[in-house]
Design a protein with these regions (language model features):
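Short loop segments at secondary-structure junctions
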Residues: 1-3, 85-87, 106-108
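Cysteine/selenocysteine-centered motifs that mediate thiol-based redox chemistry or coordinate metal-sulfur cofactors
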Residues: 1-3, 12, 18-26, 110-123
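CN hydrolase (nitrilase-like) catalytic-core segments centered on the catalytic cysteine
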Residues: 5, 15-100
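Internal catalytic-core helix/loop-beta-alpha segment
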Residues: 9
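A short, polar/charged loop-to-alpha-helix boundary motif
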Residues: 97-115
Length: 123
């Protein structure tokens, strides 16, 4: 990226915080985490996990997510979102329809949040 370093993972990786800590220590400022959480696990964990990874690493998170009922009957949660390093959801997709989301981000928020919560210097 011309404007920063992107750390990439997928779906179930979201449950392993050490992966994101390693990506951050290697310079990641943004995470891309495409996922297909089931409706049940998504409803229970999706928002919390995405926001937590953003907060604990001081990174923006781009989280595209499958939504709807698929040919095999599997129902995925959706809720694609972009979260800032403070854990604020900047934009979120509607659960009931496929759509493209976008927002303007301020990359200065990365340094600001990392200075406010200097967890990267502790471990």
């Amino acid at each position: 990226l011309l404007w920063g370093k992107l750390g990439m993972s997928i779906c179930y990786d979201l449950r392993f915080p050490n992966l994101y800590r390693k990506l951050t220590k290697k310079g990641a400022q943004f995470f891309s985490i495409p996922a297909a959480f089931t409706f049940t696990t998504g409803k229970a964990h999706w928002h919390s996990l995405i926001r937590t990874r953003a907060i604990e690493n001081g990174c923006f998170v781009f989280a595209p997510a499958q939504c709807g009922v698929h040919d095999n009957g599997r129902r995925t949660y959706g809720h694609s979102m972009i979260v800032n390093p403070w854990g604020k959801i900047l934009v979120e997709a509607n659960i009931n329809k496929k759509q493209i989301i976008s927002t303007t981000i301020n990359i200065d928020e990365i340094e600001y949040c990392r200075n406010k919560i200097p967890s990267m210097t502790k471990f």
